[in-house]
A protein has these predicted regions:
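Cys/His-rich microdomains that often coordinate metals
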Residues: 79-80, 96
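Short cysteine-rich clusters marking metal-coordination/redox-active sites
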Residues: 73-76, 89-92
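Short microdomains enriched in Cys/His and/or Lys/Arg
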Residues: 91-113
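Cys/His-enriched microdomains
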Residues: 71, 87, 105
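Generic structural signal for residues in well-ordered beta-strands
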Residues: 59-64, 97
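Flanking scaffold residues of small Cys/His-coordinated metal-binding clusters
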Residues: 67-68, 83-84, 102
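Long, charged N-terminal interaction/targeting segments
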Residues: 1-59
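Short loop/turn motifs enriched for small/polar and acidic residues
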Residues: 32-36, 65-69, 110
Length: 113
């Protein structure tokens, strides 16, 4: 379960942000997780509960923003929802491998106090 190592790193980075701000603890963390990132939001939440124990983030909340995958059709010059990195444009039926969103796995913000 790679979500544990992902969240361990997120906690480390959040605590680094708190130290840089001169704050004693992390009070919240917002993540952006793409539907094609390979990370499972429920597993990230479980891992969060495990890895934040006995850290300055022990009482912090976690918010996960799901980012749906979107591809770009060069022929139509339009973005469309897609299931994977190679999908058929619903307008012109050309296939596109130009994935614009969906692979995100990033810290959107850290709240400290």
């Amino acid at each position: 379960m790679h979500e544990v190592s992902i969240m361990a790193e997120a906690v480390r980075l959040a605590m680094e942000s708190a130290r840089a701000a001169g704050a004693p603890r992390v009070t919240g963390l917002r993540l952006r997780v793409g539907s094609l990132s390979g990370a499972v939001p429920e597993a990230l939440r479980f891992a969060w509960d495990v890895v934040r124990c006995e850290t300055p983030a022990a009482e912090a909340w976690l918010e996960i923003e799901s980012v749906p995958a979107a591809c770009w059709c060069a022929k139509c010059r339009a973005e469309f929802a897609c299931e994977n990195g190679l999908s058929e444009c619903p307008r012109c039926h050309e296939f596109s491998g130009d994935l614009r969103r969906g692979r995100e796995l990033e810290i959107a913000s850290v709240e400290v106090n």
